[in-house]
A protein has these predicted regions:
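Extended, hydrophobic alpha-helical segments in both membrane/secreted and soluble proteins
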Residues: 1-12, 29-33, 42-44, 53, ...
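Hydrophobic packing residues within well-ordered alpha-helices of enzyme cores
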Residues: 5-8, 36, 57-58, 114, ...
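Conserved C-terminal structural/oligomerization subdomain of aldehyde/semialdehyde dehydrogenase
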Residues: 16-17, 41-42, 46, 89-92, ...
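Active-site PLP-lysine loop of aminotransferase-like
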Residues: 48-50, 73-79, 88-105, 127, ...
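Adenylate-forming
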Residues: 55, 82-87, 100-101, 204-208
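Flexible glycine/proline-rich, aromatic-decorated loop/lid segments
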Residues: 60-79, 88-89, 253-264
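Conserved PLP cofactor-binding pocket of PLP-dependent enzymes
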Residues: 161-181
Length: 501
């Protein structure tokens, strides 16, 4: 990895990036990473790695604010239990790609036949020096990773789970195995999806069998893991595709194709829940996350430019913004709030789906959906209503502290709005479930809130902090992005080609 990074830096410098703008500091993450993220001069962190380390990074920067008094941005892309509801991509790069298949879910009727073919394919794999074109599987990253993977395999064996390992025997390869950190491709059969509690980052594929009538329960189990990076489904039945894509909580979903190799601008990549903070790499929201200031309409202008070339479906947006319309009508005697409702409603993009460019035989879409619940903290009525308007504009629910100010507002608001609000005791409100935070107040209160949010277990939650009276809330921080890539050729071809005359 350091050699690849060094080559990448060399290419950037050759392309004209000024010396000193980008720096390469190779070393152990525990030392170099901790030193960098702990430095007050660092104004943003982009991280790819484990969920546990991402959580530590969030806690490390939680007490710091930037020059504008805002929390330090953290973009974390982490791993997860990637499932495929029927593929054999698990062993590419020795299973060390963040979207590599971890759990293969096979319908009972095809399980035995598929496993027989998979075991045969594993036995034909060559494991050795990745510098040779004849090598199928290289080493894992280091001895610690090898030990962790082998410990997991042994644990599964001790539980009585069927474990199959195979690799093509070759004397030249065998000599390299003795000195390298190699793990033979491994197949482990599980009784239940929930048996796998954390990601195994290596050439290990777990298999779960399911009854065709239990597909909804299987998807619920996958969602319940809390991870949501990638999911694949192989089926020729449109109803099954709709069922999986409509209920799975994952950032990238693939239909009738492999799950690795996302392309910038075609399949924006990144997970949700325990698998990442967003925004998606290769998507239009990413660079905006790194800006300290920007025009409020900047994102809308960017998306409008894209919409001029590719169609956008905004049917869901109308349903999501009905509570916002009710708030706008209620604010007839509050012109400032009414104007904000109009502004947020025009800027909001939740409930939109966009067709992305891609190769013939493949359909790629990018959908923006609202986060489920947003914690809103303010000690002023106008700020509380500003936060409410922003959250309703994207279609999320609101979590308010149960105090006099917010109780009175709930009573005064129309039912279409108040039913989108939940109250919780202020002293333990950060223990409640929520997906994002909007705060108005002073910097000391903001630091304390960031530290409390960072101390939570589970998914990393970002905090937007503002001074009292500010209304430039970033709506894109309240979205969930989902990318769907469908191999249309597998279902009979690309019908759009018939329109070419």
């Amino acid at each position: 990895a350091p050699l690849i990074a060094a080559q990448g830096i060399a290419i950037l410098l050759e392309a004209g990036v000024p010396p000193g703008v980008v720096q390469l500091l190779p070393g152990q993450g525990e030392t170099v990473g901790a030193q960098l993220t702990g430095d007050d001069r660092v104004r943003g962190v982009m991280f790819t790695g484990s969920t546990e380390v991402a959580t530590l990074l969030q806690r490390n920067i939680a007490s710091r604010l930037d020059a504008q008094g805002r929390p330090i941005p953290l973009i974390a892309e982490t791993g997860g239990m990637k499932a495929m509801i029927v593929d054999s991509s698990a062993f590419d790069s020795a299973g060390q790609r963040c979207s590599a298949l971890r759990v293969l879910c096979l319908q009972d009727e095809i399980a035995d036949h598929t496993l027989k073919m998979l075991r045969g394919a594993m036995a034909e794999c060559r494991m050795g020096n990745p510098g040779r074109l004849t090598t199928d599987i290289g080493p894992v990253i280091d001895s610690e990773a090898k030990a962790n993977i082998e410990r997991h395999i042994q644990t599964m064996r001790s539980k009585g789970r069927p474990v199959f390992q195979a690799v093509r025997e070759n004397s030249e390869d065998a000599r390299e195995w003795q000195s390298g950190t190699f793990v033979a491709p491994t197949l482990i059969e599980l009784d239940d999806f929930a048996e796998l509690q954390k990601e195994v980052f290596g050439p290990v594929l777990h298999v779960v069998r399911y009854n065709r009538n239990q597909l909804p329960e299987l998807i619920e189990q996958i969602n319940a893991s809390g991870y949501g990076l990638t999911l694949g489904v192989h089926t020729r039945i449109d109803e099954t595709i709709a069922q999986v894509t409509g209920s799975a909580h994952v950032g990238n979903l693939y239909v009738n194709r492999n799950m690795v190799g996302a392309v910038v601008g075609v399949q924006p990549f990144g997970g949700e829940g325990l698998s990442g903070t967003g925004p998606k790499a290769g998507g239009p929201l990413y660079l905006y996350r790194l800006l300290a200031n920007r025009p409020e309409s900047a994102l809308a202008v960017t998306l409008a430019r894209q919409d001029a070339e590719y169609p956008v479906d905004a049917q869901l947006k109308a349903a999501l913004t009905q509570p916002l319309n009710a708030l706008r009508e209620w604010a007839a005697n509050r012109p400032e709030l009414q104007a904000l409702c109009t502004q947020y409603g025009e800027l909001a993009q939740a409930g939109t789906q966009r067709l992305l460019p891609g190769p013939t035989g493949e359909r790629n879409t990018w959908t923006l959906l609202p986060r489920e619940r947003v914690l809103c903290i303010a000690d002023d009525e106008q700020d509380a209503l500003t936060q409410l308007a922003a959250v309703l504009a994207v279609g999320s629910q609101v979590l308010w502290p149960d105090d006099t100010l917010h109780r009175q507002l709930v009573k005064a608001l129309p039912s279409a709005v108040s039913e989108r609000i939940q109250l919780a005791k202020a002293e333990n409100i950060t223990a409640q479930p929520f997906d994002a935070v909007i705060f108005h107040g002073d910097s000391d209160q903001l630091r304390a809130l960031c530290e409390a949010v960072a101390a939570r277990d589970g998914a990393i939650v970002s905090v937007q902090g503002f001074a009292r009276g500010e209304s430039n809330i970033l709506l894109e921080r309240l979205y969930i992005e989902r990318s769907l890539s469908v191999n249309t050729a597998a279902a009979g071809g690309n019908a759009s080609l018939m329109t070419i005359g």
